[in-house]
From Swiss-Prot:
Pfam families according to UniProt: UPF0102
Membrane-traversing stretches: none
Protein's recorded name: UPF0102 protein Smed_3545
Domain of life: Bacteria
Listed InterPro entries: Restrct_endonuc-II-like, tRNA_endonuc-like_dom_sf, UPF0102_YraN-like
Gene Ontology MF term list: nucleic acid binding
Family membership noted in the UniProt record: Belongs to the UPF0102 family.
Native source species: Sinorhizobium medicae (strain WSM419) (Ensifer medicae)
């Protein structure tokens, strides 16, 4: 019984996270970004969204929280290191990597509000 509840909670959290990522992607598209990848995984880490506008690559961490501050502070230094490591792997696989600039952003997704995009967050 307890394992079933735990599994249900994990599934609910996973669905909430995926929905938050799609809302964040829509926010970025409306701001003029092109979504290059979602949930990009390497053995070193994962990037929720990789978005591009011109020669700028934004590696975006999406956090679904009740408040903007909660979302920002939820990105730990360990998570930042993993995102940076994964972004280096992604960047090295791009043919035009030499002309691309990289930036790390956070999109905070809060209930009943439009997602907030914090550029150059870390």
């Amino acid at each position: 019984m307890k394992a079933e509840r735990s599994d249900d909670l994990k599934l609910k959290a996973l669905k909430r996270g995926h929905l938050a990522e799609y809302r964040a992607a829509l926010c970025l598209i409306l701001k003029g970004y092109r979504i290059v990848a979602m949930r990009y995984r390497t053995r070193l880490g994962e990037i929720d969204i990789i978005a591009r506008r011109g020669d700028l690559i934004a590696c975006v961490e999406v956090k679904a929280r009740r408040s903007f501050d909660d979302a920002i502070f939820a990105v730990s230094s360990t998570a930042q290191r993993r995102i940076r490591a994964a972004s280096e792997v992604w960047l090295s696989r791009q043919g035009d990597f030499h002309r691309l600039s990289l930036r790390y952003d956070i999109v905070a997704v809060m209930p009943w509000r439009w997602p907030r995009h914090l550029t150059d967050a870390f």
